[in-house]
Swiss-Prot record:
Native organism taxonomy: Bacteria, Bacillati, Cyanobacteriota, Cyanophyceae, Oscillatoriophycideae
Gene Ontology CC terms, in alphabetical order: plasma membrane
Keywords: ATP-binding, Fatty acid metabolism, Ligase, Lipid metabolism, Nucleotide-binding
Gene: jamA
Protein name: Medium-chain-fatty-acid--[acyl-carrier-protein] ligase JamA
Entry similarity comment: Belongs to the ATP-dependent AMP-binding enzyme family.
EC number: 6.2.1.47
CDD domains per UniProt: FAAL
Biological function: Ligase involved in the biosynthesis of jamaicamides, which show sodium channel blocking activity and fish toxicity. Initiates jamaicamide biosynthesis by the activation of the starter unit, 5-hexenoic acid, followed by the loading of the activated 5-hexenoic acid onto the acyl carrier protein JamC. In vitro, can also use 5-hexynoic acid, heptanoic acid, butanoic acid, hexanoic acid and benzoic acid.
PANTHER family xrefs: DISCO-INTERACTING PROTEIN 2 (PTHR22754:SF32), DISCO-INTERACTING PROTEIN 2 DIP2 -RELATED (PTHR22754)
Source organism per UniProt: Moorena producens (strain JHB)
Domain of life of the native organism: Bacteria
UniProt-listed Pfam families: AMP-binding, AMP-dom_DIP2-like
Length: 592
């Protein structure tokens, strides 16, 4: 069998179907435990062709289709059904019938922005939504619906391959909208094929690899590395729902142990969740020695999480060099940089005062004379990616010891944003001021390169600037959550709000449900204020403690700081109890 060259994802799946027809491609684990159904490459190809025939009857090539599916194999078939029809797929989080008022607006915005012609879903989700017809907008009522799991496989015989090539749009990846309105990132077949070759090399996928994923399929991490990469590499993938993982994170680790999984991924909170929500008794039966690549990306990677996860799970076979901190974004298809094979995750200890001035000063971890920040390396850029650190205002390259905006150049970069010419030009066609070099894609993220490795410090739009000093919200949020055991990890936001002509620091933080009846507000607020002052030399103007599960988040779980800011100003945060005034040692008034 000669080495294959693929122009499109259709070519890729048809190759697998022809040469590895009976090999298991995907299996679904009900409740994250029991394998209830699976698809071979041949079966997936047949289902995709059947769905494509139905699509080709109802819509024209290059029209858009919204995919609303629970996590599972039917989504994968629908995605490839769209590709096989030459229709642009739009993976999206299905609306929750119980919380339609909260989950529908984002979907309606996507539907309107993409001008989708059809919605694909399965029978169970279709039935749920039809029961909620009165709450659906006119946009949802007017559009065509296709229930894909009711399409007979026999239709596959009528499929005609669409006239597409490597530059054809495969799907729109709507960004999570952590700092803005979601935008549709346009990804071509060439973007995806090219990028999968990078990932295969960077994360060491081989023909004997085995994958599992629970990361949502509508998120770039779950879609590209979780689902498409196993197909590209020709390896089996075990799929479970995010809810199954979140309710009992041990299920993820048990799946890795049971099926001898080599590759799986998750954002930092997933590794933290495993630390907090698994017991010694549950961990006792794990064997994680097969896990070669545990990638950690999609949100800031915390040094404390990395070290604690390794220390906790090393006795059960987890290897220190298996944890791969990574950096990426949908606009780059997925991955920009990650740790090298065989090396430990690198952590730099930086002088906090210098970092506030966008300077990089490395100090000893044992340094007691000054406040320090720990920053985890996300490794060198993958493949042939070119990364530049640029002053976002002058558009000139930063000095090696300076923090700047991360710019990226590579064929994996997306075509642009759907129907947003100005934003596409600004983001994807940037050139360096002094040399004209480019075009680069502007990430909007801040960081620096040291010894060829990329370190991330924050988002430009989230940086808190008070009295001329830069403060990264994630650093303050970590300080806050560690200040009292009642505060939920990764469920807080540090914000800057202008009050009486001056930028002030606001802290919004969720409280654990178990503390609802016993919480001493004065103690918690006092701890928060003291910790932030000690660690960051900042005065907290206002603390708002809110109910568990109420902080604004994106569909992929990222804190929406901009939405928190709006809700704070509107007074619409779901507070733990009525706002009261607490006086700090310094005499400043704080809300709680």
């Amino acid at each position: 069998m000669s080495k294959p060259e693929f122009s499109t994802l259709i070519d890729l799946l048809q190759y697998r179907s022809h040469y590895q027809s009976a090999r298991k491609a995907y299996s679904f684990l009900q409740n994250g435990e029991k394998e209830v159904n699976s698809l071979s490459y041949k079966e997936l190809d047949e289902k995709a062709r059947a769905i494509a025939v139905e699509l080709q009857k109802q819509v024209d090539r290059n029209e858009r289709a919204l995919l609303l599916y629970p996590q599972g194999l039917e989504f994968i078939a629908a995605l490839f059904g769209c590709l096989y029809a030459g229709v642009v797929a739009i993976p999206a989080p299905p609306p929750d019938p119980i919380r339609l008022k909260r989950t529908l607006p984002r979907l309606e915005a996507i539907l309107f922005d993409a001008q989708a012609s059809v919605i694909l879903t399965d029978f169970s989700k279709y039935s749920q939504l039809k029961e909620s017809t009165s709450e659906l907008s006119s946009e949802f009522k007017r559009i065509k619906w296709i229930v894909s799991d009711k399409i007979p496989t026999a239709l596959s015989q009528k499929w005609q391959k669409p006239d597409i090539n490597s530059d054809t749009l495969a799907y729109l990846q709507y960004t999570s909208g952590s700092t803005s309105t979601p935008k549709g990132v346009m990804l071509t077949h060439k973007n995806l094929i090219h990028h999968c070759s990078y990932i295969k090399e960077a994360w060491g996928y081989t023909s004997d690899s085995i994958a599992t994923t629970w990361v949502p399929h509508f998120h770039d991490y779950g879609l590209v590395d979780g689902l498409i990469q196993p197909l590209y590499s020709g390896i089996p993938c075990y799929v479970m729902s995010p809810i199954a993982f979140y309710m009992r994170p041990i299920r993820w680790l048990q799946t890795i142990s049971r099926y001898r999984v080599t590759h799986s991924q998750g954002p930092n909170f997933a590794y933290e969740h495993c630390l907090r929500r698994t017991t010694a008794e549950q961990r006792a039966n794990l064997d994680l020695s097969s896990w070669r690549t545990a990638s950690n990306g999609a949100e800031p990677v915390r040094q404390e999480t990395v070290e604690n996860f390794i220390a906790t799970f090393e006795p059960f076979g987890f290897r220190r060099d298996a944890l791969y901190p990574a950096y990426g974004l949908a606009e780059a298809t997925l991955l920009v940089s990650t740790k090298k094979h065989g090396e430990k995750a690198r952590v730099l200890t930086l002088a906090a005062e210098a970092l506030e001035k966008n300077r990089i000063v490395v100090v000893s971890p044992a340094e007691k004379e000054q406040v320090v920040r720990f920053v985890v390396s996300c490794g060198p850029p993958i493949g042939g990616m070119k990364v530049a650190i640029v002053n976002p205002f002058t558009l000139r390259k930063c000095q090696p010891d300076q923090v700047g905006e991360i710019w990226v150049c590579d064929p994996s970069m997306a075509v642009g944003y759907w129907n947003r010419l100005e934003e596409t030009k600004k983001t994807f066609h940037a050139n360096l001021a002094e040399s004209g070099e480019g075009p680069f894609m502007r990430t909007g993220d801040l960081g620096f390169l040291k010894d060829g490795e990329l370190f991330i410090t924050g988002r430009i739009k989230d940086v808190i600037i008070i009295r001329g000093r830069n403060h990264y919200p994630q650093d303050i949020e970590l300080t806050v959550e560690k200040s009292h055991p009642s505060l939920r990890s990764s469920h807080g936001a540090a914000l800057a709000v202008e009050i009486k002509g001056e930028e002030r620091l606001i802290v919004v933080q969720e409280v654990e449900r178990s503390y609802q009846k016993t919480l001493d507000i004065n103690e918690v607020v006092g701890n928060i204020r003291e910790a932030v002052t000690d660690e960051h030399d900042l005065q907290v103007y206002s603390v708002v403690l809110i109910k568990a599960g109420s902080i604004p988040k994106t569909s992929s779980g990222k804190i929406q700081r901009s939405a928190c800011r709006v809700k704070f100003l509107e007074g619409t945060l779901d507070q733990w109890e009525a706002r009261v005034k607490v006086t700090s040692k310094s005499g400043a008034a704080v809300s709680s």
